Amino acid sequence: MTFEIPEEMEWATYDASRVWQISKGGGHNFTAEVTAVGDNGSYDYDSMIFYVSEKVDKNEFHNASNYIKGTAEIYQDHLRENIKLDKKAISTLQKNKSEEKSIERIKKGIAEMEAKIPLAKIYEHDLGIPDSHILGSKNIPFHVLLWRNQRVYYFTFSKPTENSAQRIKDLIARFRTRELYEVPNEPGICFPYGFIADDGKTAYELKNSLRFTRTPNVIFSLLTASANDPWQTRPTSGLYDSDFRPGYDRQKWKKSALLDSLHIGKRLVAFEGWRLDPRPDSGERERAWFGLAHTGGTLDPLVAIQVQTFQKGTDDLTDYTPPPEEVLPRLKALSQSIEQRLAR
């Protein structure tokens, strides 16, 4: 999917303060509190999920690798401690002959934990890929960290195969970094500052948030998914009930429906949500609004646009939230330019 940008914008990425824990998951953000939920990418290639960081020092790249290794060591220590506790429990139960069934159950659990300890160890694999940390079990790598253009790119595979090393090399050969406004010529999937070339047959689900730099209180989450994607992605992915029904002080704000329409590419769709406007004489200057529009889904490629606002004072926001009338025309220009080059 491609689209035109009417003005300067920025993508949400994995922020610098969390990059060392990028394997922990979560999602991309602008700041800790200015964020959507579930910003990342899924790619049906050994069940891959991926993230990209903002620009950071290279030490964060190495720290991210050490975190994966350290987490595995902590888990191994946790298993060893549980084994010690269970062995003490057996010693206590052996004084009572009627507890033989319980003892056998605990012994079985100990055997299972002992088997897990060597499997939990993380090994580093040398696949000949520059500036990379390839991590996994003794024979099967399933974590990939790349250092490219001062960013950390993280790929993790939840269903690696016996030939995962070769599959990782094949994937990285198709991956490349991408500048902010760069549009690749060949087919594939784009994500913030990255691109994976493919033949258009691999299922995907991507949620990436952007915002215009002159109105940072308003973020647009673009959710795209291939037809019949295995994750059964819905337009409301990452949204909560409170996003649709917000709590507010009725003396300060008036709530009303936000009903409009916009084009997603050539398709005219409804844009529905709500708005909270300050009441006259309330002394309040802040406002909030929310909207959702989508096309496709299930049998057709999905494209959804989720719009959320964040009030002045949230992290580094210094201005009040602009009204929909100020922002929606610019969003409409963007959404109308959307083009799905290869609808898989």
Language model: regions and residue ranges:
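Signature of long, low-cysteine stretches enriched in small and polar/charged residues
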Residues: 47-146, 211-299
